[in-house]
């Protein structure tokens, strides 16, 4: 462990969380914003549903830990909401069980300490045609209409147990041309979708009446910018200026600013998460479409009972 101890912000969920540190992902952006004020801790598990999350909840978030997180941002539901397969296999979790699982997750997290705050993210929408193009028959049983009730009921649960809820399902669909601009493979986020998620999270943190505030502009900066002349420049002001594009609708979008700064171009066509991961690791693509589960199993050299639908 390194010191001094900072507030901990934990991201807990499935592939939307695990891959949030890829190119300009929402987790990476939060880590950038909180780089001198808090630690962003990733606990993402691609392929998981809320049922799996419950199995490890007390291991990931033990009640007897000396240091408890200040904030936990939780995402599950995209896999739970897939269409059930006749075999009974696959990631589907019935809506009533999903809500009960999320209730248990929320109540456990709130019990960790008086200062632990919780945000639930709803399942996002998806581009069904893009999923078909990218994955072919490898992924079946996913649609916006299947996601909708999971998102709606999760928001109802948030109000019931006093957890902040963010309606990602609606927020992304309010973006112009969201079907073409928000997904790499019909399911996982582009930089544009991640920007939407970050702005929604910051909106909640800015408006919450939590004491202390966990909004990035409110947390104290760790150590002065210059020990020899600590008053010569305000690091806080410097950081606010650099990151103010998250608050102002009149400035260039985060995506455009990042692309210009890094002289990178967005892929000319949607690419699957598998393609992205294999390219990043200089590996070869198999000659046929592979599911995210297949990719994860190969990567970790583990065996799983055959699943008719891929998990995300």
Swiss-Prot record:
Protein EC: 3.1.1.-
Annotated signal peptide: 1-22
GO cellular component terms attached to this protein's record: extracellular region
Cellular localisation: Secreted
Annotated keywords: Glycoprotein, Hydrolase, Lipid degradation, Lipid metabolism, Secreted, Signal
Region of interest (Disordered), ranges: 285-312
Cystines in this chain: none
Enzyme class, first EC level, given as a word: hydrolase
GO biological process, one term: lipid catabolic process
Residues of this chain annotated as glycosylated in UniProt: 79
Record field: transmembrane: none
GO molecular function list: hydrolase activity, acting on ester bonds
Similarity section: Belongs to the 'GDSL' lipolytic enzyme family.
Record-given protein name: GDSL esterase/lipase At2g38180
Organism per entry: Arabidopsis thaliana
